[in-house]
């Protein structure tokens, strides 16, 4: 029957039953099934009733629990069919964390559906190693959002009776009571009008808002929805949470409280792990739970105790402790991190990371994150009073270690964009010693200290930037700061005859304070600072104005394109140089004259300028045809390309290098109009580059194969070089041809991909550089990951911090015959193999091996296994790696091998117990690992 609640509903919603049965003759103390009626509220506010179809004979009325007394003070009626005469129910405490099979062999009483019975949509939401899922059956009202005070009450049963003198209604046989989204089911029920209370017995189920409570007996407060269920089991379907309790209480606000209860995300037939506590509270409104006097049990064996725990029951944020991290390290000793999360508001939060290190003391780290309609960012800070004294003799060491950081991205309006990335650390050894990246600042050779404002106009972009760096190492020289940098770039809004007019403008101040004097190593040895190796013109600071207008005529057709272009780059410098640099220039000039060699260091002039025209013509054709390969249809393309570039030689030796380096040669280099990055060098060129692309494209647009090959023909030598490089002694500066540049990609299918690049020098008849990479990760099963790679490079153009000059080739570290010399230190010849592969269901092997052939050493190697099921995951990995600990300025001496065994345990639905370090090196070392984890269930 469906009834709209009358005004007296709050007192007793199920007075419907009493009103119905009270119309029967007073002499009859009960009404049998044959005398039942269906009633509804009439238009006049009364009851409109009609005879109900006869039902089966009414079973004996359930016995009223002796602990409960009706309003009339009536003692419970006696019955020959008592609970004692039947089999004793199995208690949840006897299940050892599993579901009660006595209620159903297949755990269907918990809405458990085996994997083979799930629909395709349900399987997509179920983990690959899960044997099933909790699926709430479709029922009337399950998604009803009506306020309960306004919702009608529905009652159903096979038979009912009403005792007028005690105001007790009895229902039997598939009893169902529903109001709004809440539904109560039982075999039998007694409803006590005076107390607005109901007693339910036999297969009790209470459903509401995606939660299910099952028990043997329940007391329900009919006007509020409060309930107490004895010998209870519960399920929260979406979160895959289940457990049991001596009894469970459901509050009016749907909060569930468990006495002597358990909590787990394991399947009903598993007790792999569970929380067991005296009092457990689950709050669906906040998405979090709490428990007191808690033991974490693994296979019913207690492994951890805590007097209190706060844990998530869904994906919502909430203040509380996060899973701790436990580990050891040679620099920290035993380490324990106990993060606490503050959910301050929907758009900002904070996290505190107390980090105890046995060797160093307590490091306090914290971060504050914010998000607004137009910006996002975070503040971070850390402090440690370091108890370790191993670096006490070392230059720049600070006992009070600290770091603070601000990262920000935002817009003042639709055109103005702001950005801040500022980090300050106490000393250059901070990241090496403390091994921390909790607050989003990654360890590097430098930390950035930058702020910028960008304005985007309709046809231009203006930017004001201030950028400095702080060294986070002692084995590099001090970099230049840009304080400030102003850029103004854009395109004129009109295009006469199809011409494009573009411009680039920059004004910037480059400045740095070189550290002179000596450096004291960890063992007390005194060395000269590396900044002393910066000599001559390289010590200059200065202002730079760079203007680069251009005009081009892009022509495009279906069969090809042509783009002639003319640029002019003008650069003006105002320089200052200290006395040391000036005297070094004179000394170098005298030394070159004495030996009869050419001086290539440049001369100092406070005002320098350079203007260089850049002319180019870029053109290409497009051919395609339909073809068949191995029975599959393709569109094959042939795309030849020609690029002519002319840049006259302009002497630039007297201009220092502030932000310029030389690009590494590859296929893309053939079509660049400057072989240098930055604005301090414009390379002289007279070349013609020829390239060709060949692609195989399937009918659905999938590119199966692509190959690109090209070479440049030079009509003059390249005289413009970086400081310290003599074009007369650089072989490739006077070659007539460039290396052959090759790029290749083949997709075996949508999962397997092979990429390669190769640069062959025809003059030396040897490779200059190359790499090959095979990557496999199925789209439908990202748990499988295979990476095989090899790379070789011996053509780097780099700055040598030990000599203060630029050099070409792989290069040695130091001087032959001197301490610390390492041959071919900068040459790269490495292989990298990594794999994550399921061996048997739930078990995967994890491995990586990175080897340096040039120095005959392993850079990193680890191997281990992962066990993953529906409710927990374990990784055990043995790892060797080359760590970097700066006790001197000699970089190779700071490299040392290290070894560790790492354990990671994740209890799904609760968090990781330990092993945050494992996540870090797997993410960095295995391509595809992050995609695998992001798509994991």
UniProtKB/Swiss-Prot annotation:
| Matching InterPro entries | LipoPS_assembly_LptD (IPR020889), LptD (IPR050218), LptD_C (IPR007543), OstA-like_N (IPR005653)
| Compositionally biased tracts (Low complexity) | 66-86
Q: Where is this region: Disordered?
A: 58-104
Subcellular location(s): the record lists: Cell outer membrane
Any one GO cellular component localisation term in the record: transporter complex
One Gene Ontology biological process: Gram-negative-bacterium-type cell outer membrane assembly
Swiss-Prot/TrEMBL keywords: Cell outer membrane, Membrane, Signal
A Pfam short name: LptD
| Endpoints of the signal sequence | 1-33
The similarity comment for this entry is: Belongs to the LptD family.
Quaternary structure (record) = Component of the lipopolysaccharide transport and assembly complex. Interacts with LptE and LptA.
Question: What function does the entry list?
Answer: Together with LptE, is involved in the assembly of lipopolysaccharide (LPS) at the surface of the outer membrane.
Kindly give the PANTHER family that the UniProt entry links to this protein. LPS-ASSEMBLY PROTEIN, LPS-ASSEMBLY PROTEIN LPTD
Q: Supply the name of the protein.
A: LPS-assembly protein LptD
Organism whose genome encodes this protein = Pseudomonas fluorescens (strain Pf0-1)
Q: Which gene encodes it?
A: lptD
